[in-house]
Every structure is written in C-alpha cells, then in structure tokens.
Curated annotation (Swiss-Prot):
Keyword presence, Nucleotide-binding: yes
Name of the protein described by the UniProt record: Acetate kinase
Catalytic activity: acetate + ATP = acetyl phosphate + ADP
Residues that, per the record, bind ATP: 15, 207-211, 282-284, 330-334
PANTHER family named among the record's database cross-references: ACETATE KINASE, ACETATE KINASE-RELATED
Binding-site list for substrate: 90
Length: 398
C-alpha cells in the first residue's frame, strides 16, 4: 500500500499525519517541537495506541524531517521511504498567487519565499519543511495547500479595506483570511449531512480554537471571513485581540514607547482572553474562574461570545439567512456551553440548539432542535484529510 503524509511545519515545529491509501486510515501521527533550540522533543503515535517519545536536539527542520522518516522505518510503520508516495504541505500565506492547492515545483517554492513578508513566522519554516522532505523523498508527489486560497476569490467588496486603493495595487493590502482548509472541510461535511450540494447552500462556519475565524460561505465559496490581512483580525481569540481601532493601537504604542513590532507582539500574544482576564488564555481556566465569581473573567467571556455573535449576525444579513451554522476546532467542538449560549442569542433568526443533542464533545452531530429554521452542526475539523483529498485531486489532473 502507498502512503501519503500531511505536514504542518511551524517556526520551531513539524506536525504530521501519515495515511494509508486509498483507505485514508491514519497509521501514524505526531510532532517534533523545539527545533533549533538546545533540546527538542519528538512524539509519534502509531499502531494500537503505541507512543514513541524522545528528547534530543534538532538543529534545523532538515534534521527533524530526517529523524521523523527514520523513525517511521525504525518503528515498523513503513519498510522503505518510497512507500510514502505523496507529501502535502500546509502553507499559511498564498497571497493572490495561489487560488488553489498546487503541485510544488521550483517556481512555487520561489513564490512561497516571496510571500514570507505576509507571514514571516510561517512561510519560511514551511519552505524549510518542503525542502527537507524533497531531499529525503525526491520522487514523492508534493503539493502545497494554502490557508488563504479558499478566501482568495471572495467579492472585492468584502476583500478590500476602505483605504487608498493604491495600497492594494502596490502592497497587496486586502483581506486574506485564514483557516481556509478547515472551513472547506467542514463545509463539505455539512453539505453531506444536509444531503444537498454545497453549491446550493448558505453556511456560516465557525472555527473557534486558540485562533478563531468565522466564514460566510455562499454557492460553495468564501463570501466573507473575519480574519483580515493577517490572522490578528476578527473575533476575540485566546491571546489575539481581534478587531481593534487602529488609532487606539497608535495611541497605546506611543504611551508605552515601544516599536510597531513590539505592539503587534502584544496584540498577538498578550491580548484576547488572556489580556482581558489577566489569568489565562485557556477558555476552561477562564470559565472556572468566572464560575467562582471572578468578575473580570465573566467580562472576558461575555466579550468573547459577543464578538462571535456579532460576526454571525452580520453574515446572516450578508447571506440573507443561512441553511446552517457550523462549529469546529477546540472550543467549537468541545464547549457545549459556548454553543448553547450562541444558539440561544440567535433565537430571533430561527436558530435553536437542543440541549440534549448538544451534550457532546468532538463528535459530528446535528445539535439543533427539530423545529429550528437554521441548523446548528458540530463537525470536528480534519485539515490533514482535506490536504490528502487535494493531493488525490491534483494527482488525477497531473
């Protein structure tokens, strides 16, 4: 049997899932962390619950990838490298170059490198991952799958900002969005659950995790999305601020006497639930404190829910209603109270969450009441499987 590996390389990490094909069964998954630091950590899950863990230095992505592939052989997961016939790489920023997933060649790698200014923490690391796998698996069918491609064809009225048009022409100043692979996956599953073609549906997909984005989907395509030029925009997140008045950013930056880079760092890593609660970026910690009377945590949760509610409401207006609202990712999949709260506040639109159906974690399910006008669906995301599907589609076209 041939195997396909889906890869997500971060600035100091490599995460992967290995699939048997064509069954699409996951035979191994894991990650290597702290690449480039004094001591790294590798963890691989395989077989019937077996786990391999090791602490050792990984000076760069190349050594991490070589270790990973060697371990797949050492653990008996594959017998030889050439069993892995395809590699799919998740890439954060595809700009306006890439409106779909593509087979990787030298030109594609050059473009990914050029787009690094749009995602300086991600694209360079992802390019290192591509090169590392190409060195060890030179004959594997390699594909790049972009977080931004799903949103690249959204209407200009939603993609562009109300700033001088030449900023878009000269600098690519527009909304690129993120989590596109996740939104595509759950939208396709929603269509199957509803028994209708995706092209005939109006959906609002809510990827609510540490990073969070909400997308309005019309005729199977992204119509609008909450994240913007970067993944910092949109709803309140674990450590990210979401939408903030730019004047406030400039005002506080001046008061603190810090650089633009330091200000962006604060908005990315010290804001959101963490900044509001001054306690934790983890929703569970904030909820527990709120239940014990912590007023600041109560407020943080109210703001968090309200920002999600505002985006869903605006997208219901933009789409002229919806067939379904879909929840996915860490909070969306696992937090029944959050789903119930959002559903209850959308009752005016015909949304109704059934508390009994909603009493579930991480399981694909219609959690709406039988008489709901707009369905509420819980769909665990599977970005790696979406990458595998893109590989197979491009293989057939090759």
């Amino acid at each position: 049997m041939s195997k396909t590996i889906a890869v997500n390389a971060g600035s100091s990490t490599v995460k992967f899932k290995l699939f048997d094909m064509p069954s699409e069964e996951v035979v191994a998954e894991g990650n290597i962390e702290r690449i480039g630091m004094d001591m790294g950590h590798a963890k691989i899950k395989y077989g019937d619950g077996q786990v391999s863990e090791e602490e050792k230095p990984f000076p760069n992505h190349g050594t991490a990838v070589s270790y990973l592939l060697d371990q797949l052989i050492n653990l008996g997961i594959v017998k030889e490298y050439h069993e892995i016939t395809a590699v799919g790489h998740r890439i954060v920023a595809g700009g306006e170059f890439f409106k779909d997933s593509v087979v990787i060649d030298d030109d594609v790698m050059q473009k990914i490198d050029e787009l690094a200014e749009y995602a300086p923490l991600h694209n360079p690391a992802e390019l290192q991952g591509i090169k590392a796998f190409k060195r060890v698996l030179p004959d594997a069918f390699a594909v790049a799958v972009f977080d931004t491609s799903f949103h690249s064809n959204m209407p200009e009225m939603n993609a562009l900002y109300s700033v001088p048009y030449e900023w878009y022409e000269k600098y690519g100043a527009r909304k690129y969005g993120a989590h596109g692979t996740s939104h595509r996956y759950v939208a396709s599953r929603a269509a199957e659950m509803l028994g209708k073609p995706l092209e005939d549906l109006k959906l609002i997909t809510c990827h609510i995790g540490a990073g969070a984005s909400i997308t309005a989907i019309k005729n199977g395509k992204s119509f609008d999305t909450s994240m913007g030029f970067s993944p910092l925009a949109g709803v309140t997140m674990a450590t990210r601020s979401g939408d903030v008045d730019p004047s406030l950013v400039a005002f506080v930056q001046s008061k603190l006497g810090i650089s633009s880079e330091e200000m962006i760092e604060l908005l990315n890593h010290k804001s959101g639930l963490l900044g509001l609660s001054e306690l934790s970026a983890d929703m569970r910690d904030v909820q527990a404190a709120a239940e014990h009377g912590n007023k600041q945590c109560e407020l943080a949760l109210e703001i968090y829910e309200n920002r999600v509610l505002k985006y869903i409401g605006s997208y219901l207006a933009e789409l002229g209603g919806a067939d379904a609202i879909v929840f996915t990712a860490g909070v969306g999949e696992n937090d029944k109270e959050f789903r119930q709260a959002i559903g209850d506040k959308l009752a005016y639109f015909g949304v109704k969450v059934d508390p009994e159906k909603n009493d579930v974690r991480g399981e694909e399910r219609d959690v709406s009441a039988d008489d709901a006008k707009i369905k509420v669906l819980l769909i665990p995301t599977n970005e790696e499987l979406m990458i595998v599907h893109d590989i197979e589609r491009l293989r057939k076209q090759a």
